[in-house]
């Protein structure tokens, strides 16, 4: 019996997921460059901490902390990724000394004025989508598997996404997202991949382009650190107001 596009798509997604298992935790410093439709830019500096959760019923945890400029210093987003249920996300606003829970209906909103939605910042767990293999295609002159995936979790701002995963190391190269009406919404590109611990690949240059507004957000990563002293206590909601 011929392999179905759905089964082939799931196999590719599963292999990409398998290759990134076991990293434990990571930290990285990032520069965020916001560009408006007129080409004007503004910059921010932030840190991202990630804790791998090896349970089948829960996804990874992530903490994003802004360091510059001063007016958003200390602003933080804590994400507990779920598998098929809505992710848990909390935004800490230092000026108000208040932690705000991000509801499912607000996860499609822009994260602190960027082109990334809140849901873009959760880990991309395998079971969050159904998949369909489309074919093989070059992406930035790299041989890739082209796949379509459909979010099955509540509140997604996307009806579907086209993804390109390279054949060499199963790394995401591009995600093209469509809004709930089926119109082209955003394109996320992954570039400058570097390998850590001889196993784990991380893109150091990500650009999210809004195809409807002409705005974009670029993230430039410095060197990642893996298997640090991070633990569950660093990702507790109650710790948000004590961040440094």
Regions found by a protein language model. Give the residues of each.
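Short amphipathic beta-strand and strand-loop transition segments with alternating hydrophobic
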Residues: 47-54, 132-138, 192-194
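Surface-exposed beta-loop interaction hotspot
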Residues: 123-130, 136
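Short, cationic low-complexity segments
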Residues: 242-244
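Broad gene-expression machinery/nucleic-acid interaction feature
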Residues: 27-29, 43-45, 61, 128, ...
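N-terminal mature ectodomain segment of secretory-pathway/periplasmic proteins
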Residues: 4-95
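Gly/Pro-enriched, hydrophobic low-complexity segments
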Residues: 78-80, 88-92, 98-102, 107-124, ...
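Preference for bulky hydrophobic residues occupying beta-strand positions
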Residues: 30-32, 64, 131, 149, ...
């Amino acid at each position: 019996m011929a392999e179905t596009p759905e089964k082939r798509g799931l196999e590719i997604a599963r292999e990409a997921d398998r290759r990134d298992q076991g990293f434990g935790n990571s930290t990285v410093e990032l520069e965020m460059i916001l560009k408006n439709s007129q080409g004007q830019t503004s910059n921010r500096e932030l840190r991202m901490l990630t804790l791998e959760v090896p349970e089948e019923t829960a996804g990874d945890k992530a903490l994003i902390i802004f360091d510059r400029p001063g007016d958003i210093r200390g602003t933080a987003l804590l994400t507990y990724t779920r598998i098929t249920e809505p992710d848990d996300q909390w935004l800490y606003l230092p000026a108000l000394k208040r932690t705000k829970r991000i509801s499912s209906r607000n996860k499609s909103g822009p994260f602190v004025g960027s082109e990334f939605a809140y849901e873009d910042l959760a880990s991309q767990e395998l079971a969050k989508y159904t998949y369909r293999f489309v074919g093989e295609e070059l992406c930035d002159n790299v041989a890739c598997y082209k796949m379509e995936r459909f979010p099955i979790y509540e509140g997604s701002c996307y009806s579907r996404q086209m993804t390109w995963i390279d054949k060499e190391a199963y790394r995401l190269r591009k995600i093209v997202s469509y809004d709930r009406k089926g119109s082209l919404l955003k394109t996320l590109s992954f570039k400058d991949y570097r390998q850590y611990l001889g196993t784990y690949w991380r893109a150091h240059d990500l650009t999210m382009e809004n195809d409807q507004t002409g705005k974009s957000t670029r993230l430039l990563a410095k060197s990642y650190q893996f298997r640090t002293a991070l633990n569950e206590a660093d990702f507790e909601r109650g710790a948000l107001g004590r961040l440094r």
